């Protein structure tokens, strides 16, 4: 725990009190939204057992989520819908969800700590660090809260779209999910621009043939930038083991450091 607090301690000693950690989940699934959480804790407050949500089981995450919510100064949740993912691409949708989570915080942060990539369109200073979700306490807390929130959301959608097993796999590309897609075809919360093992999801029938395996057909409005290297480090651990192939093939050359005009339009509310 001491090591998880080390980076925050440096800022606390400089008089920065409200430090927000932010992280997103749901980048790799074939269905459902991207969800982000932002968490501000009191200086030097520790939630024992916190780690990157991908390294914890569901029971551990649920307990930690309660502890974090009970002790946090502020928590913000942000989502990017399937429709938004389709319009602006998965990379931009993750940034959009994180921005919404941060803008939902009250009180506001003095500093934002984020995993891997900077977020455009927020009024506070920020630091992006690779693997922050496993090395910085407040970002680890945000990872847990986001994961629990999204898992509950997918469980609530399970009876709305019966037969797919969303309560079990949470939208990731497990064998059971792929079998359900072959049997039922995609539903409205499937990401129709995603490919899985050479097949593209489509709402006009079952999975159709595709020429190559790629995680996303990127919206042409999002031009490549010098930040593509960050996207190339897209954390495949965000996906479950069954969906790791999609995450590893995330299309880094189309990632943009700044939000596209479409993303800014979507977030105009």
Indicate where each model-derived feature is located.
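RNase H-like, Mg2+-dependent phosphodiesterase core
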Residues: 1-222, 226-227, 235, 243, ...
């Amino acid at each position: 725990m001491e090591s998880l607090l080390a980076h925050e301690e440096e800022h606390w000693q400089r008089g920065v009190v409200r430090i927000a950690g932010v992280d997103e989940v749901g980048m790799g699934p074939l269905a459902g939204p991207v969800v982000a959480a932002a968490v501000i804790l009191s200086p030097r407050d520790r939630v024992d057992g916190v780690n990157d949500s991908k390294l914890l089981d569901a029971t551990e995450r649920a307990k930690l989520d309660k502890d974090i919510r009970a002790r946090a100064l502020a928590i913000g949740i942000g989502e990017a819908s399937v429709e938004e993912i389709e319009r602006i691409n998965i990379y931009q949708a993750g940034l959009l969800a994180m921005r919404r989570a941060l803008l939902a915080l009250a009180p506001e942060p003095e500093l934002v700590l984020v995993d891997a990539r900077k977020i455009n369109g927020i009024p506070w200073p920020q630091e992006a660090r690779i693997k922050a979700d496993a090395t910085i306490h407040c970002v680890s807390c945000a990872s847990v809260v986001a994961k629990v929130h999204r898992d509950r959301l997918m469980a609530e959608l399970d009876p709305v779209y019966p037969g797919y097993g969303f309560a079990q796999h949470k939208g990731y590309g497990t064998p059971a999910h792929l079998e359900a897609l072959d049997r039922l075809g995609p539903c409205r919360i499937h990401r129709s621009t995603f490919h899985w093992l050479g097949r593209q999801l489509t709402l006009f029938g079952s999975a159709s043939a595709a020429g190559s395996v790629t995680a996303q057909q990127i919206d042409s409005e999002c031009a490549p930038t010098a930040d593509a290297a960050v996207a190339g480090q897209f954390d495949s651990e965000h996906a479950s083991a069954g969906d790791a192939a999609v995450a590893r093939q995330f299309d880094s050359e189309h990632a943009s450091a700044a939000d596209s005009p479409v993303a800014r339009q979507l977030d105009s509310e």
